[in-house]
């Protein structure tokens, strides 16, 4: 199997269990390996037939910036689930997260590495009036899911004060209270929207497909 690799992606995010770590961002480094057959893209020159590593980097940055993790183990698990859910051509994901400041003065870094295949994340699909919701992964702190809004249908959910949502459009077209959603994360942006609309309407003849992460507002760990 071919592998697309991203080496030493550097991000600043909230990660850790100690009080200072909950208040201030710290640097983490990631190595990613996406196992997929790249021959269709290699022969056609079409980036849509492979995993665009620039977009992958933005997606990972968006999730880590938004999530406020307690453990890098959970961060690695969620990154793997997200990438496998979003990128249909990817069959396995390797995620290594390094935390340089974890053992300051004692070691160069602490790290965790996970290797996940599709079968490691048995998803559940629920049919809803607007389309479908596929839960990619649910943890104590968050839920990662794909939303499919059928043509000319509208998703509406009541605001939930116990959680916040990050979302972006993967394909199709959709609009929310603040206008149309982007099908790509803006270049250089840490995340697309930390205020995911409660009302979304599919536009055009094709379904709108979105990724969404719900972050639960936990009072204690």
Regions found by a protein language model. Name each.
Residues 1-137, 142-147, 151, 168-171, ...:
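N-terminal, polar/charged subdomain of small-to-medium soluble alpha/beta proteins
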Residues 153-157:
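Short, charged beta-strand/loop "edge" motif centered at a coil->beta-strand transition
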Residues 160-179:
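Glycine- and acidic-residue-biased ligand/ion/polar-headgroup-sensing regions
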Residues 178-198:
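Short acidic-glycine-tyrosine-enriched beta hairpin
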Residues 182-184, 206, 217:
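Short, surface-exposed beta-strand-loop junctions and turns on beta-sheet-rich folds
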Residues 198-205:
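Asparagine-centered strand-capping/turn motif at beta-strand->loop junctions
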Residues 207-212:
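C-terminal interaction-tip segments
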């Amino acid at each position: 199997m071919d592998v697309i690799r991203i080496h030493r992606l550097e991000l600043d995010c909230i990660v850790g269990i100690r009080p200072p770590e909950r208040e201030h961002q710290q640097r983490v480094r990631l190595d990613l390996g996406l196992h997929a057959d790249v021959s269709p893209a290699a022969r056609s020159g079409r980036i849509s037939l492979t995993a665009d590593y620039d977009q992958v980097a933005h997606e990972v940055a968006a999730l880590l910036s938004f999530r406020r993790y307690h453990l890098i183990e959970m961060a690695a698990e969620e990154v793997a689930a997200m990438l496998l859910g979003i990128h249909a051509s990817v069959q396995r994901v390797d995620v290594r997260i390094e935390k340089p400041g974890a053992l300051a003065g004692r070691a160069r870094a602490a790290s965790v590495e996970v290797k996940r295949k599709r079968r490691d994340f048995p998803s559940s699909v629920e049919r809803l009036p607007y389309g479908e919701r596929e839960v990619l992964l649910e943890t104590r702190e968050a839920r990662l899911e794909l939303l499919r809004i059928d043509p000319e249908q509208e998703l509406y959910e009541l605001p939930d004060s116990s959680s916040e949502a990050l979302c972006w459009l993967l394909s199709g077209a959709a609009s929310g209270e603040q206008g149309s959603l982007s099908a790509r994360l803006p270049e250089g942006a840490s995340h697309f929207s930390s205020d995911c609309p409660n009302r979304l309407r599919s536009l055009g003849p094709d379904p709108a497909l979105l990724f969404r992460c719900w972050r639960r507002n936990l009072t204690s760990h």
